[in-house]
């Protein structure tokens, strides 16, 4: 598939990276980051479980300065999760602008995992590397804010 794409780009006189940049400008630039909050031993497992329960009881209104527009608790809510996904210890925050944050305990280690996906609009002439760096910085700030909200930092 990639070879076909590269050949199409070559025939059109554009580079593959230019084609990718065009897709970013049309659909937005997405970045993803994650943060793992490790708490050792049985006490750590209990602390993580308590943090997840507290999160379900008291949801943040903003994360990293971005408004949380909605939440999905995959432990419940069978009507909103994919059919193939059973009940999970997973909470998803829907962010203003189309981003999301996921929080879940690890299934194998005493750690809580936070995943952040953000999208930013890119205009013609924008430096893609700089735009990606700004989005990643914002994603890290969102993950750090959720960690603080949970009392982990």
Predicted regions and their residues:
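Phosphate-binding and adjacent anionic-ligand microenvironments
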Residues: 1-105, 113-115, 122-153
